[in-house]
Amino acid sequence: MEYEKVCNEILSCNNEIRYVAIYDYGELYEKMKPGINNYLTKEETEVSLSQAIYRWSTRKKTVSKIGNPIFAMAKYEKVYRITIPIGGAGLILVTTELSANVNEITEKILKIRSKYSTN
């Protein structure tokens, strides 16, 4: 998969997106909006993503009852954080400004993901 291309396309789809990362097979691919400082170090981001992947695995336990999970979103004091599965075990992580229309951004990310992945 062309992770760098996916990150670039997601980052450019909305000006309120701060950061995009794809974590897949133990590798982290990331892109940050120019002029923005990341709140987390790369190591902290990797730990956070590995924890998010675990949470996604627990969500899949209820698939037979409520269907496949599509995305997860959390609001923090400084950012929104959106996670979306990609590939077999990968995860897209996007952070946005609090002023962002996160539902609109999430729909755009899902469309971009569908161009590069079957899920």
Q: Which residues does each predicted region cover?
A:
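Non-catalytic interaction/Regulatory regions outside core domains
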Residues: M1-N119
